[in-house]
Amino acid sequence: MNKTKLTSWGNNREKEVVFTDIPEHGTINVGNQNSYGDCFFPKNANAFKNRELQDINYKFNSSMTMDDLITKNRIGLYGVPGKRNVTLGGAIASDTHGKDNIWGGSFARNIKDIYIQLPNNEKLVVSRDKDFDIFQSTIGGYGLTGSILGCSFIDDLPKYSNFYNKSIITGNSLEELLSKIKFQNKVFTVCWIDLLSNKKDWVIENFEENLNINKP
């Protein structure tokens, strides 16, 4: 069997593994390896990489990417990470956040229920109303509760525009930066601070919906 080198985000660890479609004891789920943190490595030489779900009618399976969801399915989501090929399973497992996290929260806000296979091979649908402990531990649990196979989303998802105005604010004191962030009410906000500078120079980029453009 062909082995693939699995590395951590910081490339400080690596291991050769065989990707399998069948979750087994000792394996661990792998998405597209876009986590900003150094995630877990499988105990043995196998890593589970789910490609398709054949046994359920869940529209959103764990191998779908943010690009599949947003671009192809036109779904608005909270807490969208900064890379388009992050998998849905990975976004749930790490409970991602995005440039909307000041008001939108994390990826957990999107999730209605999760279809999961436990280490004993039992398959469950867990939610805030059913098996809440497993549901809560799975979101942000990096797959340690079991294999995330799919999910469904809440009905009240955000609706985003195709057109935004960008504004840029600059300054050079932390006090001013914090006051500016506190009173921002934008859809997306990005901030950089130059910590190597004695002046603590900073930049804020804000994005808000452009209501003057006719939407297609």
Predicted features, each with a name:
Residues 2-85, 91-100, 191:
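Glycine-rich N-terminal segment of FAD-binding domains in flavoprotein oxidoreductases
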Residues 20, 37-54, 100-121, 147-154:
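Structural signature of FAD isoalloxazine-binding scaffolds in flavoprotein oxidoreductases
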Residues 42, 80, 86, 108-110, ...:
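A short, structural micro-pattern
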Residues 73-74, 104, 128-132:
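"Short basic amphipathic alpha-helical interaction patches in structured regions
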Residues 93, 111-216:
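C-terminal substrate-binding/cap subdomain adjacent to the FAD-binding core in PCMH-type
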